[in-house]
Amino acid sequence: MAKHLFTSESVSEGHPDKIADQISDAVLDAILQQDPKARVACETYVKTGMVLVGGEITTSAWVDIEEITRNTVREIGYVHSDMGFDANSCAVLSAIGKQSPDINQGVDRADPLEQGAGDQGLMFGYATNETDVLMPAPITYAHRLVQRQAEVRKNGTLPWLRPDAKSQVTFQYDDGKIVGIDAVVLSTQHAEDIDQKSLQEAVMEEIIKPILPSEWLNTSTKFFINPTGRFVIGGPMGDCGLTGRKIIVDTYGGMARHGGGAFSGKDPSKVDRSAAYAARYVAKNIVAAGLADRCEIQVSYAIGVAEPTSIMVETFGTEKVPAEQLILLVREFFDLRPYGLIQMLDLLHPIYKETAAYGHFGRENFPWEKIDKAQLLRDAAGLK
């Protein structure tokens, strides 16, 4: 492969779509804490002064959706009306129904291992050895920039920062290997009284330089810090937010394909979420085992059917064993039936709110990031 550029973006926890994702997953977590077998599909809409939480939830649990919503918005940092959104005074509306019994009869089974998929669909998982977390570098560093923005906002280092922010990083590749960073974009909401020059200097020193490796930066690297010159109006006052609208930010930043299904607000019976996590787990273990430098997994399902309708392994010419052998290894070591992958990754716990900002992949505390099958795969493949 010749020289090329590749760009990924991320958004902060205060971005309107991410507020919605975090509320949906906070509701999911609260329900799973009481009822691990609950069926949850929770969607959220946010706009100036209001939050609407809707969807289909079937559970024995009772949760206070208004309190969960306000606490989530408060933790993000929207606590004053001058930000255009206030956790203490915003309206919280609820429109929750129950899961269709037609769907339910296709999912539940007397034998849990025969649990059917909650819907048809296709999901992808990906891993690459270009970073220590086996994720693409562009999305990894885009996430780290907005995470750092939240950190220095909350710890008081840059008290004039506000919750809404976006990042974008363009990497230079030569023959598939990173040779540098071509461009960095960071836009952050801010208080009215900070001037542009002071903001740009502070963002460079406190956010960008501590995060991006200096060996990838050079005199030709371009930096765009609040390029419009002003970002006071942000969050839900600037744009409405919806659950599930940042699916590329949530996954691989465009480096891998995406099946189209969003994650947040969905319990693990929804393969949109759980099978995408399992596909990442498979791909990461294949790369960690040294069986390939890059690996993309596709799985697909039919509603009400336990066995996947297809499994694909793509290694982009980087495989160390034949592709046919990789498929056999995946089938041998990973149970990709809906209940099997729930058990394999221990998914019936309230672990989802943390996934809802800064990416679902590449953070070691999530169970689908374990590489506990890597040595087994390596041994079975006959690699020394």
Curated annotation (Swiss-Prot):
What cofactor requirement does the entry state?
Answer: Mg(2+); K(+)
> Which key words tag this protein in UniProt?
ATP-binding, Cytoplasm, Magnesium, Metal-binding, Nucleotide-binding, One-carbon metabolism, Potassium, Transferase
PROSITE patterns assigned? ADOMET_SYNTHASE_1, ADOMET_SYNTHASE_2
Q: Which CDD domains match?
A: S-AdoMet_synt (cd18079)
Q: Where does Mg(2+) bind?
A: D17
Domain of life of the native organism: Bacteria
Per its UniProt record, what Gene3D superfamilies does this chain match? 3.30.300.10
The pathway where this protein functions is:
Amino-acid biosynthesis; S-adenosyl-L-methionine biosynthesis; S-adenosyl-L-methionine from L-methionine: step 1/1
Q: Can you quote a single GO CC term?
A: cytoplasm
Instruction: Identify the residues that bind ATP.
Output: H15, D164, A165, K166, R230, F231, D239, R245, K246, A262, K266
Cystines in this chain: none
NCBIfam families, alphabetically? metK (TIGR01034)
Q: Which HAMAP family match?
A: S_AdoMet_synth1 (MF_00086)
Under which name does UniProt file this protein?
S-adenosylmethionine synthase
